[in-house]
């Protein structure tokens, strides 16, 4: 979640040889305080430099303000150093891990004797404020040799590892090493110049700690050194830092709203789903109300796929391991698969093998099985494009540390399609598939998109460079033709082909990766897929992988947070609830709900002993879109009164009109929450 930062490019600034960048910035009249203060500069090669940097020749640089994303990132990295200094002041035996800036904040990992408590975080915040108030200067120092660095950092084992292992220099979370020099940043007393604290770091940093006007520590958690569960256990402290108190307050309010919308919290409050310990991590179960929402999501998707010419298939959950040897998954995706199940082995009495067993795997992806369906009989060019679709359950061994509610699970159902077409059909099929995906997402109320093009990872791919280049170029053409912003994702593709992913912004402006469209020339080769062309020649089809929701579970979680649990009426598990003013009027509402049920509406009457106002509060909390009230006048007039989630109301609507209004609203699949203002025009019809 990010509050948008102004990304205006400052005019180039000339820094004379022998002059610090900071001096040139001040003499040019740039702001010296406030959210637009310049914190670093960008040189001609795009590298961010400290304001203390002194070029040897005249250079043009771009001043970078605190209120830009790059400026914020530098502030957050410096705040991570302040945090680390505070931790070592409060916990002198703490050893330093890594402390990078991340989206909207920063973290630092520490080896300490026990987990941090909320009270610890409060103490650390107090200590950080003292450090910031002291205006310590960040001073870059080049270490003469690796040996000198080892001596200076002898008490920091994790830093020593980073010095010796340069494999992390391209990792954005490894800020300690990189480039041609080994550098340490000292925090200096502004009056005496004495070193107060230091850390191995490649920088850059803000000039002084006073350039951190707003920060907050948000939480702590367990972590592993370098993210590897086989490494040392560490404690991670997260925080956020901003260019102004106003910007931070805006972010914290956004964070609070995100917590209110957290699908895990709402899943419990609305009785939608749960994660029983007995099943294991990342394996959700959907309760009846959640099951209704999921069924409605799937049913609408099915109807749209039928209209678009998809054919439905079904495949098993497990398969022999040989299938994934053919597909390449065991070579390239084994770490993401559950371990093999060795079955069907028979032993003699002496323990020797009479009949060898076989390895079976839970399927991590549906594509190999869909290829077997394509290959089950001869195919003609007349059948292409062939669009095979399945709500297919797959299982992936996600590390426990990354599992998160419904948005990152181990068992999931993908709305998975594989399209087989000729090369001549490829571009048109990609174009129509992308448009189909975007239109269907809009039908669920998501309509703010951009595209991301993931290209080849040079260390992890199969197939020829020529084929990859053709596939990538075609996807790029289709993405650009859509009119949406196309953002590059270098090296982000799966091993078998480049992809376009649809990135969706929700009601809070957060970005979620949703649909993927992946071009694959590789698997048809590995599975020897063929069709007979119009010239009678056997030809390889082009294969397109396509998942619209990503997974049903993930999409469910995203929609829950997008709507804050107040699902559109067509998806709501309970669409209408009748609330009598007194028990005597309950039968009237029961008759109304019978009519609604006959029209396919999910309706019920609250017969509880609670007072009417409490019933209204309860069903408002449960996000019921339509509440129908009935008192003496309503019964006498054969009418009901509408009450909506926002507290608005329309009184005295004839029952038949009320049924019509509700069924039409649901039938149109309106994604807005019904209110008196929105429903009133239908009353007048």
Swiss-Prot record:
It holds the Pfam family tRNA_SAD. One of its GO terms (cellular component) is cytoplasm. Disulfide bonds: none annotated. Its cofactor is Zn(2+). Zn(2+) binds at residues 367, 418, 545. Its main location: cytoplasm. InterPro entries: aa-tRNA-synt_IIb, aa-tRNA-synth_II, aa-tRNA-synth_II/BPL/LPL, Anticodon-bd, Anticodon-bd_dom_sf, TGS, Thr-tRNA-ligase_IIa, Thr/Ala-tRNA-synth_IIc_edit. Residues 1-28 are annotated as: Disordered. Homodimer. Belongs to the class-II aminoacyl-tRNA synthetase family. This is Threonine--tRNA ligase. It comes from Rhodococcus erythropolis (strain PR4 / NBRC 100887).
């Amino acid at each position: 979640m990010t509050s948008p930062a102004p990304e205006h490019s400052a005019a180039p600034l000339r820094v004379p040889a022998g002059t610090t960048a900071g001096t040139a910035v001040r003499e040019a009249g740039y702001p010296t305080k406030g959210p637009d203060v310049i914190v670093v500069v960008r040189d001609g090669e795009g590298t961010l430099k400290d304001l203390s940097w002194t070029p040897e020749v005249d250079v043009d640089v771009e001043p970078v303000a605190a209120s830009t994303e790059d400026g914020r990132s530098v502030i957050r990295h410096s705040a991570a150093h302040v945090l680390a200094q505070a931790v070592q002041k409060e916990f002198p035996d703490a050893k330093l891990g890594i402390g990078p800036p991340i989206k909207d904040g920063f973290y630092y990992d520490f080896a300490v004797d026990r987990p941090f408590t909320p009270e610890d975080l409060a103490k650390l915040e107090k200590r950080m404020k003292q450090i910031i108030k002291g205006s310590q200067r960040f001073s870059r120092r080049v270490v003469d040799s690796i040996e000198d660095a080892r001596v200076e950092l002898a008490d920091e084992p994790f830093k020593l590892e980073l010095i010796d292992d340069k494999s992390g220099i391209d990792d954005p979370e490894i800020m300690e090493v990189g480039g041609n020099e080994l550098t340490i940043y000292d925090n200096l007393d502004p009056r005496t110049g004495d070193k107060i604290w230091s850390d191995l770091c490649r920088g850059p940093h803000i000039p002084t700690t006073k350039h951190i006007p707003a920060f907050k520590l948000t939480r702590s958690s367990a972590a592993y050194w370098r993210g590897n569960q086989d490494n040392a256990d560490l404690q991670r402290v997260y925080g956020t830092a901003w260019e102004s108190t106003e910007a931070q307050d805006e972010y914290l309010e956004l964070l609070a709203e995100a917590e209110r919308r957290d699908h895990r919290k709402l899943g419990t409050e609305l009785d939608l789903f749960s994660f029983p310990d007995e099943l294991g991590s990342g394996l959700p179960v959907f309760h009846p109300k959640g099951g209704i929402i999921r069924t409605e999501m799937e049913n609408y998707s099915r109807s749209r796929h039928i209209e678009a010419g998809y054919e439905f298939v079904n495949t098993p959950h497990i398969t022999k391991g040989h299938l994934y040897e053919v597909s390449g998954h065991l070579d390239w995706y084994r770490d993401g698969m559950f371990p093999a199940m060795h079955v069907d082995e028979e032993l003699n009495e002496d323990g020797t093998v009479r009949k060898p067993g076989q390895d079976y795997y839970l399927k991590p992806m549906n594509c190999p099985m869909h290829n077997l369906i394509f290959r089950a009989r001869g195919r003609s060019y007349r059948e292409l494009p062939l669009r095979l679709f399945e709500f297919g359950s797959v299982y992936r061994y996600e590390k426990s540390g990354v599992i998160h509610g419904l948005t990152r699970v181990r068992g999931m159902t993908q709305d998975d399609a594989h399209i087989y077409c000729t090369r001549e059909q490829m571009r048109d099929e990609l174009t129509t598939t992308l448009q189909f995906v975007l239109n269907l997402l809009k039908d669920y109320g998501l309509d703010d998109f951009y595209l991301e093009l993931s290209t080849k990872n040079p260390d992890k791919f199969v197939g020829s460079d020529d084929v990859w280049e053709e596939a990538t170029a075609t996807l790029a053409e289709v993405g650009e033709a859509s009119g949406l912003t196309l953002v590059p994702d270098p090296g982000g593709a799966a091993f078998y082909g480049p992809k376009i992913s649809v990135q969706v912004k929700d009601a809070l402006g957060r970005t979620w990766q949703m649909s993927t469209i992946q071009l694959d020339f590789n698997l048809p080769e590995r599975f020897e897929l063929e069709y007979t062309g119009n010239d009678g020649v056997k030809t390889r089809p082009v294969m397109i992988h396509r998942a619209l929701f990503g997974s049903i579970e993930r999409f469910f979680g995203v929609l829950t947070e997008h709507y804050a649990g107040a699902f559109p009426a067509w998806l709501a598990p309970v669409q209408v609830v009748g609330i009598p003013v007194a028990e005597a009027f309950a039968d009237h509402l029961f008759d109304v709900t019978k009519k609604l049920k006959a029209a396919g509406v999910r309706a019920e009457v609250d017969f509880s002993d609670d007072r009417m106002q409490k019933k209204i509060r309860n069903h408002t909390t449960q996000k019921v879109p339509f509440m129908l009230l009935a008192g003496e006048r309503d019964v006498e007039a054969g009418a009901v009164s509408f009450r909506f989630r926002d507290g608005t109301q329309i009184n005295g609507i004839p029952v038949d009109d009320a049924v019509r209004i509700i069924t039409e609203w649901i039938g149109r699949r309106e994604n807005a929450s019904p209110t008196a203002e929105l429903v009133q025009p239908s009353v007048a019809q």
